[in-house]
Design a protein with these regions (language model features):
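Active-site phosphate-binding strand-loop segment of PLP-dependent enzymes
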Residues: 137-197, 308
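Short loop-beta-helix segment that forms the pyridoxal 5′-phosphate
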Residues: 77-99
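N-terminal "arm"/small-domain region of PLP-dependent enzymes with the aminotransferase-like
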Residues: 1-64, 78, 152-153
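PLP-dependent aminotransferase-like
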Residues: 95, 102-159
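Conserved PLP-binding catalytic core of the aspartate aminotransferase-like
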Residues: 280-281, 294-326
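Conserved PLP-binding active-site segment of the aspartate aminotransferase-like
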Residues: 308-313, 327-365
């Protein structure tokens, strides 16, 4: 098992601060994976879209160039009820994150930690970290954050909401408070996991009245389509035009992603999607209740589709047992900035997968 772990660490190092995919584990380590609890998506929504995709004739979508970005933005705008002039469609939310953060390279940035590492990987200069801690369940003190940003003369503030990996949230009212007290600060709100919280808490449409606000959304998580690479940003048209003129983004979305955008707007699909979403959210409640019975591990409440667990010991042994003994792939968090090396993240999956994860963790829990 030690040899396998060393090979995994090598593979992990090649992936930077992100996790190797299941494909990489299977192909490079020849590891059987029965449960991918690292992957963050709604499996029921994935199954739903696949059923629609199988009925489509995809030949032309593969053969010909897809429409350009602004055309796809108009298709998306009808589905999400956002003015297309304020939209950029990205090759995954990650493309939007990278391009937007590059526009702020010379700015004084505040990153709330622990959080998604790409925000501080792209540009390591001029970053001021605002740390949350486990004693406060990683909840954000908005008043202290505002004071911090004012004192440090912050020009760009990044808020991942719900946050990854902690699953904590900042309410819409608190976000508006931040906007009010930091009127000259560019604020990036990453809502990649908002669909697992409450879509009414989204600040997408606040962009209309706040030119300094940028909202980033992923379609991969909630719809289970990570392989299609599809996300978007809502921002002031001047910002999007600046990015278009600098980076192009002419054909950055593929034909299969176009099919999804077209399918997304179908009334029947929307009806079935809501049922898939409700089923998944109900399963998350059950999974959290299961995890909360672990006596020697602390499970943190989450408003996303994952949970972080403090195992109270170096996480390597726990991770290795799950992966190499139980064929369960989880997210080891010992590389997360300002997070102790005792934390593990598990994703909510199907009922069957959740039960496998819980049963394996119970075995570990008894040994702690």
């Amino acid at each position: 098992m030690t040899n396998y772990y060393e090979k995994f660490i090598k593979l992990k190092s090649e992936s930077g601060l992100h996790s190797p995919s299941v494909f990489e584990l299977r192909n490079n380590l020849n590891l059987p994976i029965s449960v991918d609890s690292c992957f963050l998506c709604n499996p029921y929504a994935f199954e739903l879209f696949m059923n629609y995709l199988k009925k489509r004739d995809i030949e032309d979508y593969v053969k010909y160039y897809p429409p350009q970005n602004k055309v796809l933005s108009k298709i998306l705008s009808k589905n999400i009820d956002v003015n297309p002039d304020f939209l950029m469609v990205g090759n995954g939310a990650i493309q939007m994150i990278e391009l937007i953060m590059r526009e702020f390279e010379s700015k004084r940035k505040c990153i709330i930690t622990p959080t998604f590492s790409t925000y501080y990987e792209i540009d390591e200069q001029n970053i001021f970290f605002f740390k949350t801690n486990k004693e406060d369940n990683f909840n954000l003190d908005v008043n202290k954050l505002i004071e911090f940003c004012i004192n440090k003369e912050i020009e760009v503030l990044v808020i991942v909401n719900p946050n990854n990996p902690t699953g904590t949230v900042v309410t819409k009212n608190d976000l508006k408070k931040i906007f009010k007290h930091l009127p000259k600060t560019s604020i990036v709100v990453d809502e990649s996991f908002i669909d697992f919280y409450d879509t009414n808490q989204s600040v997408e449409k606040e962009v209309y009245n706040n030119k300094n606000l940028i909202v980033i959304r992923s379609l991969s998580k909630d719809f289970g389509i990570a392989g299609l690479r599809l996300g978007y940003a809502v921002c002031d048209p001047k910002m999007s035009e600046k990015i278009f003129s600098k980076y192009g983004l002419c054909w950055n979305i593929n034909g299969l992603a176009q099919i999804f955008l077209e399918t997304m707007g179908l009334p029947e699909f929307q009806k079935n999607y809501k049922l898939a979403r409700e089923k998944y959210l109900q399963g998350r409640k059950v999974f959290y209740n299961q995890l909360s019975t672990l006596k020697n591990m602390k499970v943190y409440e989450s408003h996303a589709n994952f949970f972080i667990i403090d195992c109270g010991k170096n996480i390597n042994d726990v991770f290795s047992f799950l992966l190499f003994e139980k064929e369960i792939y989880t997210r080891i968090l010992n590389d997360k900035l300002h997070l102790e090396d005792t934390f593990l993240r598990v994703a909510c999956g199907t009922e069957e997968d959740n039960n496998k994860v819980y049963d394996a963790l119970k075995i570990i829990d008894k040994k702690l």
